[in-house]
Regions:
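The conserved Walker
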Residues: 112
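C-terminal accessory "lid"/substrate-recognition subdomains
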Residues: 251, 259, 265-285
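Conserved substrate/cofactor phosphate-moiety recognition/catalytic segment
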Residues: 121, 125-166, 264
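Conserved nucleotide-sensing/catalytic segment adjacent to the nucleotide-binding pocket
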Residues: 145-196
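A glycine- and Lys/Arg-enriched "phosphate-lid" helix/loop adjacent to the NTP-binding pocket
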Residues: 192-259, 272
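Conserved lysine of the Walker
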Residues: 116
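Hydrophobic anchor at the beta1->P-loop junction of P-loop NTPases
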Residues: 108
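Nucleotidyltransferase catalytic core that binds NTPs
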Residues: 1-104
């Protein structure tokens, strides 16, 4: 349950009880709330805390004290409905553990030397970071020499996903990501000569991709593999095919570096126009 997990993360020593019996249909000041709460919590209630006046009557029905928290909405100038409808405008008021639910993820993919790392850093600095770096680069830097093995690519995905989960708690409304399991699956095809179905089973599509074209000059780097333009183009074609095979939402970004920046900024601005869509928070259903 989404809200229950949030509360348990924020207050690990508290016992969180979910009232999920249709009581949500009652008005907040309905006197039936007292018996409903006693049914879920038969023990004595010492205090009822809230930011609205209805808690006074609720506390009385439970023989408890009331405590109205921030009644003028100065510390938290928005209610839960406003946050859900426009979370990006209230981002600073959303606790870290809640942010990933409302966050959108934008992943940068493309062949080597097309600006993935640069663009992820650029966008994070412009719109608020941090961003999720490519885990494969430090792995490549410190690995032993020799051909890649399938299990190494799984290890790279493990590291990347773990970093993403942690960094998402501190990121802005858009989580910028350099590379992901889908691109790692394409790397498997390039390095091993065949696909890895068990690796592809781990693909989790973001809200949107930026696919960077290979039409910029190659920049030499000891951690890079495919400098020949025909191999870069093959890599690009494989990525594009993989995106389309999985029905991924993506924008092709091409041209000079300044053109790539402008196109990428436009993508982010479009993503920020609407909140992330959900079927609803389970505790509200």
């Amino acid at each position: 349950m989404v809200r229950k997990s949030w509360m348990e993360s924020l207050f690990p020593e508290a016992v969180v009880i979910v009232v999920n019996n249709g009581a949500r249909l009652l008005a907040s000041n309905d006197p039936k709330w007292g018996p409903i709460i006693r049914g879920f919590h038969p023990e004595a209630v010492d205090r009822v805390i809230g930011s609205e006046g209805y808690i006074v009557a609720l506390a009385k029905s439970l023989n408890a004290q009331h405590f109205i928290l921030d009644p003028m909405w100065m510390a938290f100038p928005a209610n839960s409905i406003e946050v859900r409808e426009d979370p990006f405008s209230h981002w600073k008021s959303i606790p870290d553990h809640v942010r990933p639910y409302f966050q959108k993820r934008l992943t940068l993919v493309g062949p080597e030397s097309t600006g993935k790392s640069y663009m992820a850093d650029f966008l994070a600095k412009k719109f608020g970071g941090p961003y999720v770096p490519e885990y494969g680069r430090p792995y490549e830097k410190y690995r032993s020499s020799g051909d890649y093995r399938a299990e190494e690519l799984h290890f790279i995905v493990d590291g990347h996903v773990a970093h993403r989960k942690t960094l998402s708690l501190k990121a802005g409304p858009i989580l910028f990501e350099d590379t992901d399991p889908l691109l790692t699956a394409v790397w498997a095809e390039m390095l091993l000569g065949h696909s890895l179905p068990d690796l592809e089973a781990r693909i989790d599509l973001p809200d949107h991709y930026i696919l960077l074209d290979a039409n910029v000059p190659w920049e030499e780097d000891p951690l890079r593999y495919y400098s020949k333009q025909e191999l870069r183009q093959e890599f690009f074609t494989k990525i594009k095919s993989k995106l389309e095979a999985y029905g991924a939402s993506y924008t092709l970004v091409s041209g000079s570096w300044s053109e790539r920046e402008a196109q990428s900024v436009a993508v982010v601005k479009e993503m920020l126009k609407t909140p992330k869509l959900h079927g609803g928070i389970d505790a509200q259903k």
